[in-house]
């Protein structure tokens, strides 16, 4: 799902912040 991809990207981005 697109939602799964967005969720994974958001999780990855929060690791950089």
Swiss-Prot record:
It comes from the Eukaryota. This is Unknown protein 6. It comes from Pseudotsuga menziesii. The lineage of its organism: Eukaryota, Viridiplantae, Streptophyta, Embryophyta, Tracheophyta.
């Amino acid at each position: 799902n697109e939602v799964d991809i967005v969720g994974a990207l958001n999780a990855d981005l929060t690791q950089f912040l």
